[in-house]
């Protein structure tokens, strides 16, 4: 690169400009008013990500800028329309073979950003779009930050979600900028904040419309060095010796309670932030780089990164061997909880007009109210303007007949689990909708081939299984039957992605994938209960293992009637190993459906209309369940044994699903279990976990359990074959370390 090194401030026609090669990511131009503009644009990529190979470019650009004697300020802005810098390219970690390699990688990032922080004239980050991870660390190194008031603009440090910590100074600069309590919250959760929230917490200095973002950033740079605003008194109090000791003690206890020790990055984040506050910046940066290097080599980080790469690769696949049809309008049959949720994500995330049909106007009103209420939360938190809520609400309409269905491209059916009713829905849509309209059933148990049995256009019938609550659960299963066309598959996957969902394509067999691996897990938990193990002990064992909730709690939340409805179908189609314990029927006969009717395995006190305590009462077991089941609760099994019994049933069934081509590959099986059930992410999913244990150990464990508890534990043929041939589900270079997760072995 070459650069004109002189500026004549009296002649505004002179402009210094870097002559950069076509592939340059960082380019510098200097305005007549002596403000330099550094534009970041990774050519060929949709978003900007930082790579190690860019370090020399950044250093050279900064050297060129510093050589301009009359330069008054710098503005860093993105050349992408909707993204600032989405983070660092985490594939760089794959090239690190030791903790020292990863440590050096972090130190290089720290060194480059230190040059920005020490730049002799003000450097301003003009932020529009995603400013995450390394992107936010770069912005933190700048002397000022201006961001756009736009829904696309979010700021965050999500490294903890990959089992890492911010490695380029984020753990040191953020606490000093916004205060230690706010910084710890952001770094430990990985949560993203929007523009107004970022301004309120002191993360950015101004929020402006996008069309004047650059102008305001330039004016900020011209203003010279400005005094840093004082932290709020609460944050100043927490930075003192007593406040700091109290805060870190509370944060550490809460973190340990939440992570159960399964996510080492959280503990290291607390240590590194504390190190910098207690011993100063140099010690903090050194601790940050060291911790980054060590965390990059942990099996937990490897597992979490594998999930990231898995979902990234899945998003690039259409699901079918054809191009999807364009989707302009969507229909939803049924305005209940599922139908209302599907309409919600279609309108608010996909931005598509959606027409709801329900036999009762009340159902339509409930569906509309659901979206109104969810958007209302965003309005109240200042994340959405009332006018935008109104605009999104106008995308949803309803009717008690098929008026308006003539021009929909896909209809999602969410009515009762009744085969004849669903077949009638297919016939109605084929009659009232357009010839190209796809019929997608949200069934959780009925075969799609049966639903399509009487269809005139069976190639346009498919399953689309959402999980409740629809707006929170990220997974959907796309279920083609034998006659479903590739175009229908691709179009359905495309709709799910527009709705913000992670979609896996699974075979049309009983239980599909998620419910099929969940059923034996729940059944085994029920057997532990019938063996006399207390309800709370069973749940705690699986929560300690890493699941977000225990299996008994999950059954209560889903609905005992719903959760057990699929069991007879699985028994009929797949055999007796799916049979629930016979005495478990008394739970349903007693009218217990779980939280939804206030009667389950736990007590659900009625909501009080009076004074609301800030802390909810601790959930209590309904001890009358023990009398109903005829058992005397007594904790006699170790937590590890309970967890082993339940999870081994799930692992065995997951392997069967792969062997029977229910799922297309181990990757989809891992994604389905993590996002559909809450399988511990730090284990990477059932197949990553089995690789870490080794097929031989899985088979040996299953055989021992079969000897002790019955033939339901007999290992499937695929696992036996893999154990004999010492095979893995993933290639060795993509597998977790052999010694990974020893606490779960």
Curated annotation (Swiss-Prot):
GO biological processes: fatty acid beta-oxidation
Chain ranges passing through the membrane: none
tRNA-binding listed as a keyword: no
Subcellular location: Cytoplasm
Reaction equation(s) it catalyzes: a (3S)-3-hydroxyacyl-CoA = a (2E)-enoyl-CoA + H2O; a 4-saturated-(3S)-3-hydroxyacyl-CoA = a (3E)-enoyl-CoA + H2O; a (3S)-3-hydroxyacyl-CoA + NAD(+) = a 3-oxoacyl-CoA + NADH + H(+); (3S)-3-hydroxybutanoyl-CoA = (3R)-3-hydroxybutanoyl-CoA
Superkingdom of source: Bacteria
Major location category of this protein: cytoplasm
Enoyl-CoA hydratase: annotated span: 47-209
Region (3-hydroxyacyl-CoA dehydrogenase): 325-745
InterPro entries to which the protein is assigned, alphabetical: 3-OHacyl-CoA_DH_CS, 3-OHacyl-CoA_DH_NAD-bd, 3HC_DH_C, 6-PGluconate_DH-like_C_sf, ClpP/crotonase-like_dom_sf, Enoyl-CoA_hydra/iso, FA_oxidation_alpha_subunit, FadJ
Single GO MF descriptor: enoyl-CoA hydratase activity
Key words of the record: Cytoplasm, Fatty acid metabolism, Isomerase, Lipid degradation, Lipid metabolism, Lyase, Multifunctional enzyme, NAD, Oxidoreductase
GO CC entries: cytoplasm
Keyword Oxidoreductase annotated: yes
Its biological purpose: Catalyzes the formation of a hydroxyacyl-CoA by addition of water on enoyl-CoA. Also exhibits 3-hydroxyacyl-CoA epimerase and 3-hydroxyacyl-CoA dehydrogenase activities.
Cross-referenced HAMAP family: FadJ
Assembly and interaction partners: Heterotetramer of two alpha chains (FadJ) and two beta chains (FadI).
Family to which this protein belongs: In the N-terminal section; belongs to the enoyl-CoA hydratase/isomerase family.
Record-given protein name: Fatty acid oxidation complex subunit alpha
Organism of derivation: Yersinia enterocolitica serotype O:8 / biotype 1B (strain NCTC 13174 / 8081)
